[in-house]
Amino acid sequence: MSAALQQAALGLAAGEVPIGSVVEADGKIIARAFWRLRDGLLAHPELVALQASNRRDVTLITTLEPCLLCMAAAMFAFARRVVYALESPTDGGTRIEDFWNPAAGSVAPYRFPEVVGGVERARSRQLVAEFLERHPDAPLARWAETLV
């Protein structure tokens, strides 16, 4: 999680909402990203890191609970595990597991990854609070307020 938090801090330094992600395989970080809203609404760090890793059986480590889009991406990338720091009450996607029920005998290869939440929650929340102090009128400030 420390590497994901470092990515989030880089995002904060760049004036972005501090969300960072890394992808780990075989105990090594193979991809990393932080949110760059200026790169587009879909440039979520989870998506960017998963795409850059281009591997199966990875662990996605992120400072914010992945949204539905990012959880689906983790499933489609065959991530084995998702670890996150801070819950996202308005759009967190890890609860999709409660509804994910592939049809019996389905040939769909996608499986819901193991999910671990709350790792370094306080540090991630602190970074979001720092962002709000520095950028109270940022485009996503109102949403970011739901995280602290």
Model regions and ranges:
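Active-site metal-coordination segments of metallo-dependent hydrolases
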Residues: 1, 38-43
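Zinc-dependent deaminase
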Residues: 1-11, 73-148
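Small-residue (primarily alanine) positions within well-ordered alpha-helices
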Residues: 4, 8-11, 21, 31, ...
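Short, flexible loop/turn motifs enriched in small residues
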Residues: 14-18
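Short beta-strand scaffold segments in enzyme catalytic cores
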Residues: 19-27
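A structural signal for isolated positions on well-ordered beta-strands in alpha/beta enzyme cores
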Residues: 22, 59-61, 81-83
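Short beta->alpha transition motifs characteristic of CBS
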Residues: 30-37, 114
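Short HxH-centered metal-ligating active-site micro-motif
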Residues: 42-76
